[in-house]
Amino acid sequence: PFRTGEEGTPALPLVHDMETKFFEQLLIDCDREFQELIKKLQISQSAIPTILDYYESHDADSLTKKIKSIKSFCGIYAPLTKVENGYIPDYTSRYFTEDIPYGLILIKSYAVKYNVSTPKIDSIILWAQENMGKKYLIDGELNGENIDETIAKYIIE
């Protein structure tokens, strides 16, 4: 249900239970893009290791297993809202209202500034902005009508 948010999920899932190979592979792909940016910024990989290194994993399956084994992630509910046919993502939760404009947009801003390609990160921004009713990224450029609500204006000039 988190992929589209249109169909309700019947129960309120824990974030821990939503960890799947699909999401972990997307996380790995985004991390690869982020690591390319880290190289351009000349930051040591030892300062910011890859997600696979950090979680002592080697692929999406092992990362999924590792994250599901972390006790501190248990008991955290996904940011969802109750609707008639179950639950849908709550696009007003801080997972969206903070993590997109001050997280992914921050990374994307530096990627633009340092000419690093971010197709997977872009796909998440596009998905989120559509569901949040915001416009940050238009045709690969951070020039949407809501971009001034983000940190991008301080990075890209």
Locate each region found by the language model.
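NAD(P)-dependent Rossmann-like dehydrogenase/reductase catalytic/cofactor-binding core
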Residues: 2-17, 21-157
